[in-house]
């Protein structure tokens, strides 16, 4: 691994949530040159854990969250603060424009470049698809033509999610999160554009960039009630820190169809700024959406990360 510069202790952002110390004493021994993967639901303290590991043992914090890549979302995505990013090496945070598309394939290529730097990676985030692509490989699925994407957008809007699910092949429907409109639409587009189900394409996956056996993989499994309280408290802190202004800055080019528009809380606060709902209703809806997202994350991690070392919280 490459030699690292000395650095000062990392500061803490106004809305950063720490991880209780006791569960961390149960961590496995991690060699200083071994890659670390940290997955966990939103507001579970995974970013604080990643920063602590890099501060104590060296390396670079690498983002594995699909929304923290966008430059327009620092507060709503709970991206590390500018001071935190300056205090420790960070990669793949806030480097993608709001109107750009960004997929697991884009992320995987950029992670490959980070691994080539030679610093020990501590890869942290809540996007399960990124971790599975990294440790299991990612199928080379053809790009969706714009006309198929437009057809899918119209189909979802007119017929609804349930109808789109019914039109998927059985093998794919059994493997993806059918409650996630983005995942369902992507699978529908692949089938429509190629005539083959997403599951068939995934069966031809290339070897993984970082096999699970070559890393220390940690998954945070928090108590749901404890996590729900943290989610609500963190959103209040985000609002106090300027999240509404952050959303206001995106209004001129706001497009709900963009991947960046999936940031939890953004659609709700946009609705308020457009005079459609009062602020307290927008905040309540954003908190609910965040808790629902955390539940979907916990389900993914429980089903797909059974070989990962568990960190039970609190």
UniProtKB/Swiss-Prot annotation:
Protein name per UniProt: tRNA dimethylallyltransferase
The organism of origin for this protein: Cereibacter sphaeroides (strain ATCC 17029 / ATH 2.4.9)
SUPFAM superfamilies, sorted: P-loop containing nucleoside triphosphate hydrolases
Keywords for this protein: ATP-binding, Magnesium, Nucleotide-binding, Transferase, tRNA processing
Name of the coding gene: miaA
Keyword Coiled coil tagged: no
GO term, biological process aspect, one: tRNA modification
Alphabetized HAMAP family for the sequence: IPP_trans
Site, as annotated: Interaction with substrate tRNA: 127, 149
Region Disordered, residue ranges: 1-24
